[in-house]
Amino acid sequence: MKEYRVYLERARSRQQDFLYPLIFREYIYGLAYSHNFNRSIFMENGGYDNKYSLLNVKRLITRMYQQNHLIISANDSNKNPFLGYNKNFYSQIISEGFAIIVEIPFFLQLSSSLEEAEIIKSYKNVRSIHSIFPFLEDKFTYLNYVSDIRIPYPIHLEILIQILRYWVKDVPFFHLLRLFLYHFCNWNCFIPTKKSISTFSKRNPRLFLFLHNFYVCEYESIFLFLRNKSSHLRLKSFSVFFERIFFYAKREHLVEVFSKDFSYTLPFFKDPNIHYVRYQGKCILASKNVPFLMNKWKYYFIHLWQCFFDVWSQPRTININQLSEHSFQLLGYFSNVRLNRSVVRSQMLQNTFLIEIVSKKLDIIVPIIPLIRSLAKAKFCNVLGHPISKPVWADSSDFDIIERFLRICRNLSHYYNGSSKKKSLYRIKYILRLSCIKTLACKHKSTVRAFLKRSGSEELLEEFFTEEEEILSLIFPRDSFSLHRFHRNRIWYLDILFSNDLVNDE
């Protein structure tokens, strides 16, 4: 992002705080090209010079103003070898350019705030997924109810642009952005459909992510204002968690954990203790509220979305459950609260008392049924969880087949090592192990038993169970590390940069 700062300073020297002139600077689209399209399938064999022309970008922008629907003429086809991809290719180039340009002022504002707060540079690789870990590690001592909330979408394009205009005062830029979204993305309907949003997000991932993050950022800022008005407890702020590498830190107070800090003073407050966390389009609101107050928060959210964002949200999209009786799903985990009861004998003079202490613990469980469903969809097992062979991999070498299965197993183990109960994870490993053996036997046209007896692959396939433990034994001192401790403790890996497919299926 250092080059972004240079480009913005260069533009400010010509026109103060205006983003519109940057649209016609070739280096912006050069950055967009190198950022996204070097990974494109149909462009990976070519270079920048013969695939992209700023002149064509300017022509398309001119036609946007003329409302010619970006039709490429025959003369243009002689100059550009990508006749069939002209509209898609240059629309994505312009979309990337818009995303880069509109990110610049927000990134500069964010970086300056982090410098003022003396945030160390090592935090730049922290993602918002890491903010979930304190939530999942909390004891939930004073929390009784949980609200499972889905942030409604789609939101209309005009609302997004109006929100952005509060932050960036550049009318020509937003006028051109509006034209682009209407012509390229088919957002000319009164109410955008989920199908159109999905198509737009796939074709323009960076711009869509920016618009969605800004919408969520605005919603959370209003929610936090309401929360501050309802409680005397100070918020614990985590402002360094990034949704992406280059842009969007959670504005303020991303995760609010109070029970440890206020365990003694909490009963003296009448206002509720709120525990809030969000990732992607789902958020969890846990509180020590009576059902009436939780329903009050529920209708706060509904009226906020309907009145401020013009997004229709129905009460059934927000579920309120008692923690001791219900569970919830977050980040691909299945979570519930377990009550631990213990009896303490207390003696005062000659009288003896038995005191029953009830403590709460959040259990993070691997969702076995959705995982088996995902494995069945990928043809590793059937719907009942019985392992099957993977014939499409039979053309590969034995080493490549084993390495593919090991990679999947490592990724699952890496992601779900924070689980408090790992039996389901071991079952998934067992399915993958047998699927690998059956695939190798299918390749060699043999039965599983005959293949194992002939090749002696049992020891090699033990890596599915032993590799993770060997790695941890190198990290921890041998005198303090034990297999029992490995099974019992939860370990969160900070190199988890994205969630698995189960998060999107919830």
Swiss-Prot record:
Subcellular location: Plastid, Chloroplast
InterPro entries, A to Z: Domain_X, Maturase_MatK, Maturase_MatK_N
Chief subcellular location: plastid
GO biological process: mRNA processing; RNA splicing; tRNA processing
HAMAP family: MatK
Record function comment: Usually encoded in the trnK tRNA gene intron. Probably assists in splicing its own and other chloroplast group II introns.
Listed name of the protein: Maturase K
Native source species: Trifolium thalii
Gene name per UniProt: matK
